[in-house]
Amino acid sequence: MTKAYSTRVLTFLILISLMAVTLNLFPTVEAKKRSRDAPIVKGLSWNFYQKACPKVENIIRKELKKVFKRDIGLAAAILRIHFHDCFVQGCEASVLLAGSASGPGEQSSIPNLTLRQQAFVVINNLRALVQKKCGQVVSCSDILALAARDSVVLSGGPDYAVPLGRRDSLAFASQETTLNNLPPPFFNASQLIADFANRNLNITDLVALSGGHTIGIAHCPSFTDRLYPNQDPTMNQFFANSLKRTCPTANSSNTQVNDIRSPDVFDNKYYVDLMNRQGLFTSDQDLFVDKRTRGIVESFAIDQQLFFDYFTVAMIKMGQMSVLTGTQGEIRSNCSARNTQSFMSVLEEGIEEAISMI
């Protein structure tokens, strides 16, 4: 019997034994219906653009189908940008802003250096398509929230309604603020639980949102602390050996898929990875190690629909964190710059040219 076969058999036996347990921890309902039952903050609504831009969701999904057909990896990249936006200042598209004379933008902060630049281009292209059809009425923050949802759906995950009506921020966070608000991959379960609780996200939300790692890639330095100088004892040895081949040194520039079983499919295999001690980050694997979150991991591993149901609820909750609504903020014409910046840039260039002629 080969080692790989033994691992598969062990996985199967674990899942079978867990399926024999009666699970009353979570109720299961249809994800789309459940999402509509989620509470929404004042200023957002399920049909915000019904009159101003009724086809906005169709425009975005149609374009993303083309984009992901060329590069499915962009689905995970867009989803990650949405997470990184919401966890810093709230879901107001500040992560999309490029740096300015006031300083570097959020994209220059260490946790955001590995965000794919092409994904930002995709968001701006969506902005242009929507604006061409409807005018400047749909915010970049709403476009990003819808694009994140469609990244999940078009990768095989659940469809869900997205409350709309967000406005775009007028400023980006400092690099320090950005760094301090994004949970690092070396956080353990206790640190994650506390961090999420500060955002009114509970333990189930934490485990469900972590399931976003079922797609995408990670750069070696984000997890090699578990390999060098000493190997994390919670890591499967065969998995560790594979990672060491991918990342021969702690600072290797190589990348590794987050989910070794189905890296480009949004499913529940991420939780199966954790049960087999094949989670990539400490923040992943410790969800199975810690008794407070282990049961949720096990439940999601054996019931994909259960995971989908709770993921959609958690995404809707996260997508409403510290949103701007009404007359707050603005609706950007270009997602990477404030509306006034285009004019100011021209003015500054004119002043510089005039000074050079003196």
UniProtKB/Swiss-Prot annotation:
GO terms for molecular function: heme binding; lactoperoxidase activity; metal ion binding. PROSITE patterns: PEROXIDASE_1 (PS00435), PEROXIDASE_2 (PS00436), PEROXIDASE_4 (PS50873). One of its GO terms (biological process) is hydrogen peroxide catabolic process. Its EC number is 1.11.1.7. The keyword Nucleotidyltransferase does not apply. Keywords: Calcium, Disulfide bond, Glycoprotein, Heme, Hydrogen peroxide, Iron, Metal-binding, Oxidoreductase, Peroxidase, Secreted, Signal, Vacuole. Residues 1-31 form the signal peptide. Ca(2+) 1 binds at residues 85, 88, 90, 92, 94. Ca(2+) 2 binds at residues 214, 259, 262, 267. Expressed in roots and leaves. Induction: Induced either by incompatible fungal pathogen attack, or by methyl jasmonate, a plant defense-related signaling molecule. It is found in: Secreted; Vacuole. Glycans are attached at residues 188, 202, 251, 334. Heme b binds at residue 213. The active site is at 84 (proton acceptor). It comes from the Eukaryota. It is an enzyme of class 1 (oxidoreductase). Removal of H(2)O(2), oxidation of toxic reductants, biosynthesis and degradation of lignin, suberization, auxin catabolism, response to environmental stresses such as wounding, pathogen attack and oxidative stress. These functions might be dependent on each isozyme/isoform in each plant tissue. Belongs to the peroxidase family. Classical plant (class III) peroxidase subfamily. This is Peroxidase 12. It comes from Arabidopsis thaliana (Mouse-ear cress).
